[in-house]
Amino acid sequence: MQKILVGGITGSGKTTMAKGISARLNLPFVEIDGLFHGPGWTKRPEFFEDIKRVTDEPAWVMDSYGYSIVREILLSKADTLIWLDYPRWQIMPRVIKRSIRRAVTKEVLWNGNFETFKNFAQPDHPIRWAWSQFGPRRKLMSNLLSDPAYKHLEVIHLKNIRAAREWFRELARVGRS
């Protein structure tokens, strides 16, 4: 477990899990949204090259595989995929609370971007995205995992928050021994 992707729908806790794994295993953490988003929510022109550079490193933990332009690179270079496959009823309260908190506090995200209440109506807003993409993203992951090109991946399929916490506790215990 040296090149780790954490996958799941928006709001599943990918970044939190990836940061925790990074700290526990002492591996570099890479936040994919920080590489993707430029000022004004634009795509950074360097995104593809940055991903290639990062994935050529001997070890990393990345918090998503979601951008289709780099999905193949990420899945082919990773050795482990942690799939946070929680039920919708566990996802939605998390993403709603996070979006409200970010809009109220004007939390600065990547390259000066921040969520606003005005953006809640946009189809790609995290709340709407998590709802509309729940089924399609699950199907995408199942299809990807049945692709022979990705048989090399060790897949850790965590089906609810409790299972994820238990798995992480075990990782922490093993990491200390």
Predicted feature residues:
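The conserved Walker
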Residues: 10
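NTP-dependent small-molecule kinase module
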Residues: 24, 128-177
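Conserved nucleotide-sensing/catalytic segment adjacent to the nucleotide-binding pocket
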Residues: 28-81, 86
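Hydrophobic anchor at the beta1->P-loop junction of P-loop NTPases
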Residues: 6
